[in-house]
């Protein structure tokens, strides 16, 4: 009887290990696919930068200049020099778009309350929690203007704490879910004096 229980436990352990490895493999595949999609969009964006003449200066404060690439609308790029990472940023967000690139969640540059959401893929926002206060973050608009920020705070918020996420106390906030999905890793950035 003990031998049979041991065999069942061993088989169950192997099955759980295989399930975990399968999940890890699937997540890595998704991360690689997302990284490729972001790289392809960055390449296209580099060729499609809107010139200052084509950017509408009479836009509402919450509207940002945008370009369309392969049916998706982008408002800029984010660069993280300390992470050696550059990503395109989509104009609006939904869960499908997050599979390809970080997305503007709310706010804008003009109103100094831009919030960007990204998936926790390694090739997207998966390393946000490694940023340190003082690290540089650069947002480049579709008309080529660079906005420099420094990380002021890295915090963890509850997944349901949308009021704090969008409170507008920082000109740039970036967030992603943690690996359990129960909380949001949030990076708060201040405008940099070193322009």
Question: How should each PLM-predicted stretch be described?
Answer:
Residues 4-195:
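Solvent-exposed, non-transmembrane regions of membrane-associated and secreted proteins
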């Amino acid at each position: 009887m003990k031998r049979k229980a041991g065999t069942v436990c061993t088989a169950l352990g192997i099955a759980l290990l295989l399930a975990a490895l399968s999940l890890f493999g699937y997540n890595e595949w998704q991360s690689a696919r997302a990284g490729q999609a972001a790289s392809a969009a960055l390449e296209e964006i580099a060729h499609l930068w809107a010139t200052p003449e084509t950017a509408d200066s009479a836009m509402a404060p919450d509207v940002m200049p945008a370009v369309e690439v392969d049916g998706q609308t982008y408002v800029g790029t984010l660069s993280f020099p300390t992470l050696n990472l550059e990503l395109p940023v989509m104009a609006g967000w939904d869960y499908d778009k997050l599979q390809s690139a970080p997305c503007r969640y709310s706010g804008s540059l003009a109103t100094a309350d831009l919030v960007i959401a990204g998936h926790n893929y390694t090739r997207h926002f998966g390393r946000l929690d490694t940023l340190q206060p003082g690290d540089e973050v650069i947002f480049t608009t579709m008309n080529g203007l660079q906005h420099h920020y420094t990380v002021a705070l890295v915090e963890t918020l509850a997944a349901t704490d949308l009021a704090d996420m969008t409170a507008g106390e920082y000109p740039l906030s970036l967030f992603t879910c943690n690996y359990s999905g129960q909380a949001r890793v949030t990076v708060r950035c201040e405008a940099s004096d070193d322009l």
